[in-house]
């Protein structure tokens, strides 16, 4: 049933979905532009073809290079964060994964919150905000879950240098650990 739902969207609104893939294990993978995500989720939640759908997880990950080639266009960005929404239909046991395609706007602007549609998204968006630094527009609860208040670090973002700036060396004379600048020896 969901296959026909997404095929109908691809036929009537081709600019909403960039890619649509269905698998044997009742999983559907959709690559969506982030400005259509909220409206597609509203349609998923309140349409009769997918009556009992729930949001299971929102997660993000980082890659060294993120480039996706689809049949319609090529997406290649310097941003390395991908945001994935995981939905589950309780009646048909279908799983839907919505992947945000416009990754450059994920880091530069705020994503629209799904808090009005799914109550579980409040907690999941707080996790993403805290761990990856992703901001959500319209979010009411901005408390931290795990980090201390005032801590602006994002532990899951790989913003550290790939080459060490200092080395940790054990000094036998002073019987302590010493940080020395990294040097290459010839």
Q: What is the role of each PLM region?
A:
Residues 1-186:
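Terminal low-complexity/charged segments
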């Amino acid at each position: 049933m969901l296959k026909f739902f997404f095929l109908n969207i691809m036929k009537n609104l081709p600019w909403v979905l960039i890619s649509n893939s269905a698998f044997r294990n009742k999983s559907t993978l959709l690559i969506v532009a982030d400005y259509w995500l909220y409206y597609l989720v509203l349609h998923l939640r309140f349409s009769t073809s997918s009556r009992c759908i729930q949001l299971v997880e929102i997660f993000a990950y980082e890659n060294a290079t993120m480039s996706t080639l689809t049949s319609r266009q090529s997406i290649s960005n310097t941003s390395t964060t991908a945001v994935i929404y995981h939905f589950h239909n309780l009646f048909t046991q279908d799983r839907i994964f919505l992947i945000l395609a416009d990754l450059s706007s994920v880091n530069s602007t705020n994503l629209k919150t799904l808090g009005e549609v799914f109550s579980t998204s409040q907690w999941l968006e707080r996790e993403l905000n805290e761990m990856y630094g992703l901001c959500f527009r319209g979010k009411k609860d901005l408390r931290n879950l795990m980090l201390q208040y005032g801590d602006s670090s994002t532990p899951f973002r790989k913003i550290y240098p790939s080459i060490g700036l200092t080395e940790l060396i054990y000094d036998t004379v002073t019987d302590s650990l010493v940080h020395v600048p990294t040097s290459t020896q010839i």
